[in-house]
């Protein structure tokens, strides 16, 4: 369930989630069940979207009460969105310092979220900077696709 919500897709999302949980229930590497990925990138938050996520969340907990649920949210989802109240863990795909903004905005984003919701779990589900190993630079810059910038990016993310 990715990028765009379709009102007539609810039965399909529930069926796929059930198949996934039944198939992978005993897999040791599954820590959480993901409800959706960047679903608000091309869809507005509306009642249909919220109800579909509630149904998915309820189904996950019914079929596997031992694992939490999560959503991988795109950065522009409003921090007050009712969608954020549904999963057990809210995760974010953030590319500050690559597609937009500066690297230190990752820290600011998580600090702001945690200050507003100190009791909610949060995850960092996606981040990165594309690179071509053939591109090197003594003075790497955001967006230059050098492996040098990717190293700078990752060293600041992983401190």
Predicted regions: what they are:
Residues 110, 150-155:
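Short, hydrophobic/amphipathic alpha-helical packing segments
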């Amino acid at each position: 369930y990715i990028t765009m919500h379709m009102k007539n897709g609810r039965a399909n999302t529930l069926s796929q989630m059930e198949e996934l949980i039944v198939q992978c229930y005993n897999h040791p590497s599954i820590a959480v069940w993901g409800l959706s990925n960047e679903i608000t990138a091309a869809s507005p938050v509306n009642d249909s979207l919220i109800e579909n996520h509630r149904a998915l969340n309820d189904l996950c907990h019914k079929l596997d009460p031992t694992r939490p649920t999560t959503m991988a949210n795109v950065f522009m989802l409003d921090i007050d969105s009712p969608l954020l109240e549904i999963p057990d863990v809210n995760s974010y795909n953030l590319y500050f310092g690559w597609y937009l903004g500066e690297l230190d905005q990752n820290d600011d984003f998580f600090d702001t979220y945690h200050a507003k919701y100190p009791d909610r779990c949060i995850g960092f589900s996606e981040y990165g900077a594309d690179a071509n190993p053939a591109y090197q630079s003594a003075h790497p810059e955001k967006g230059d696709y050098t492996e040098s910038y990717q190293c700078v990016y990752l060293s600041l993310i992983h401190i």
